[in-house]
Amino acid sequence: VQYDLTFKTKFVREPIPFDTEEGEMDYTFPTDAEVIVTDFIEGYGMIQLIIADESYAVDFYFNADAMDPVIGVPAGVYPIDGSFESGTVLACKGILPDGPAQSYFCGLDAEGYLDPLQLYCLVDGTVIVENVNGKMKVEVDAVNSYDVPVVLHYNAADSAVENIPTEKVGTQKRIRT
């Protein structure tokens, strides 16, 4: 007797406590944001990347075979998942006693500490890292455990001169003489 079985299932993601339940995030870090790249577990292939400014921070854990000698994280397209496979970003698994585990985006309070009311645990999506003339560019298209979209941008190659808006200002100031 031979049976031909087909199973269909719907993946149900478990919400992570303290994860933001609504309100999508689209944020561009300034070119002068602080960037920290470390070989988190030397020899294991885990590279930590933190990008932070006065208001927000993002913390990624890349599974990579080696650090890039110029920008730290090797250029590439990295899916966010929990596989620990080379070429991936480790998905957030939840909150530990000292803060969120693995990859997350969050707001910062006035003292620079993580704001638990602005926490996005990155559980699925893609992180693209590029080397643009020796400068790091990062694009993130992800979701948290509530499927709230998180889109992030960082481009160290941009300069203030290149980013000047070209549209006319709605209000003009004049000086009387």
List the model feature ranges, each with a label.
Residues 28-130, 175-177:
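Surface-exposed helix/loop patches within compact recognition domains
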